[in-house]
Structure formats: C-alpha cells, structure tokens
Amino acid sequence: MPAIRMRSILVLPLKWILFCVLGVPIAALLALTSAAFRERGERVSSSPAASKYVEALDTRVLVQRRGSTDSPAVVFVSGTGGWSGLWDRYMRRTVDLGFQAVAIDLPPFGYALPVPTGDYSKARQGRRLLAAIDSLKLEHVVIVAHSIGAAPVMEAAFQHPSKIRALILIDPALGLDGPQTDGSDSTLQTVFRHAWISRPVTAILTNTHLTAALLRRVITEKNQATPEWVRLYQQPLSLQGTSKAISEWLPEVLSRRGHAASDNLSAYATLPFPVKLIWGETDTITPLSQGKHLQQLLADSSLVVIPRAGHGPFLEEPDLFEEVLAAALSSL
C-alpha cells in the first residue's frame, strides 16, 4: 500500500484519538471552571423575599407560601430544573379559590440545600417531602407535581396516604411502561455514578447559555420558551454547589423500574384519594400513551389533555392550563 494512502487512512482515527485524549479533558476542565465561576450565590442569603427554609429529613428546603395558613393546602413540586418560582401565577389562582398555596424546592433544584449524603433516590426524596410537609404542620394536602417531580410525590403518597387529599400530576415521569427489574443500576447509571464523568456533564447542562435551548427541547410550542421563563429557570443556576448536587442526582433520573413503592403497578389501584392527570397533547418526553396507561392503573382518576402543549403545559398553554388546574381544585 502506498505511503500516501496509508497516511490518509490513519489520519481520521488519529484525529479522533487526539480529540479524545486532549479535547474531552480540556472541554471538561473548561465546563468545570465555568461552573465554579458562575456558582457563587449563597443560597439562604439570596433566597426570594418572603420565602423560608424548613427542615426536610437530612437537609433544609426552601418554601414559598401564599394565602391563609388556616386554609387547606395545595403543595406544588417542580420537575427537572424547576423550582418554586415557576408556580407564582398558579399559586395566586389557587389562593383565589380558597386554598393556601405552598411551593417546595426539593433538592438538588432551586434553593434547597444540597443533600450531604448525595442520596437522591425517589424513596428518600419522598421522605424529604413528607418531612417538609410535617415541618409546615400541614395535613391532608393536595399535591400538584410536574414531570420527574411526581416520582418522590408518589413515594410519599404510598408511604403515608393519610396525609394526601388528592394528587394533580402534570405529565408525570414515573417510568411505569418499562419492564420491572431487580432495581440494580443500568450501565448508564453506573457510568454517571463516577463524578469525573457526571460533574463535567452537569456543569455543561447547567450553563445558562444553554438554558433556552434545553427548555425548547422539552416543549412543543418553542416560542413559549420566552425570556421570562428562561430567566426563571436560570435563576438558581448561580447558586453554590448547584452542578455538583445535580451530578449526584443525575443517575437517579436514569433508573429503571425496580422495587420502590411507586414501581408496583398493582399498588396504584389501592390509593384512597383521587388523582387528576393533566397531559400535554404532543408531549414527547412522557407521551400521552403513558397518561392513558396510568389512568387505567388508578381507581379514582381523570385525564385532561391540553391541546398543542408538549411536556410543559403550564408554560406552553398558561391560560388553558390555569383553567384546567382551577377546575381540578374546585372539584375537590
């Protein structure tokens, strides 16, 4: 084989090897450096006005509360990257309906303090949610949860159903369509248990220059990723330790259906309270088929589909979502 042809055959793989040896570590270092420079805000001192921290098992979580503390409580729990500040409009409507509205930041998101142990399993998160509810001295609550935020909510509901009056789940990401496993880590989970992999990845994902693009990826109505919504999602990303905490949580979002309480399909029919499902018609993250499946598992449930909306109906179709939420609350 001529030497020139041999060189041309070798040049591409050599470039890839050089990129992997030099490019990837350099990119990781730049991402971590950028995160360290960006994440300078102290959580408690920079928390929103009128918010407060309460004990939540092994950490403290931020709570925003509206309305009379004598009124029945509606608790809002966000999904991936979300926090209590997303719910302000819907909290006001909730108060107008005669409830008190309570939005809780569950770690690692928002202003909640990162968990010292790094354990973000949904069962543990469910216990943290229950502990926060106890700290607030709330009983018989309605919980509104979005996306992956529904996983700890379901764990809490199965652990202490007597504390729950009703659930309102918005495009919940529960992973119930997958086969049941022994609960051991998948290959991808195992990979992301290594901090030297997960830390650079989350440092990139939490870069505020990518917030708008990432938000558009999970919604269908791309124009609804407005500057106002983007700023809301960006706000907690400047807090100390954010990307590190999310890197410890990341493997949990990749978990398969195992033997947690909320993984048991037959258990859903035993829930002694109504579950109201709100779903984006065009959701590609948790498709509508999952909503129909979940409705079949539940003994007392309803499913309302938000036209045109994807995985974030509360930001894609805010007026319609507000009316659907108000109707769900008024029916309780």
Regions found by a protein language model. Give the residues of each.
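Alpha/beta-hydrolase fold catalytic core
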Residues: P2-V74, D96-F99, E139, S330-L332
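Conserved alpha/beta-hydrolase catalytic His-Asp/Glu region
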Residues: E42-R43, Q180, T202-A267
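Active-site loop/oxyanion-hole signature of alpha/beta-hydrolase fold enzymes
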Residues: V54-L57, Q64, A103-V144, I148, ...
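Conserved HGGG/HGGXW glycine-rich cap/lid loop of the alpha/beta-hydrolase fold
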Residues: R66-Y111
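Flexible "cap/lid" loop of the alpha/beta hydrolase fold
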Residues: F158, L167-R199
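Short beta-strand/loop motif that positions the catalytic acidic residue
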Residues: L271, L277-W279
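Acidic catalytic loop of the alpha/beta-hydrolase fold
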Residues: T282-T286
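Catalytic active-site module of serine/aspartate enzymes centered on a nucleophile-bearing elbow/loop
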Residues: D300-L332
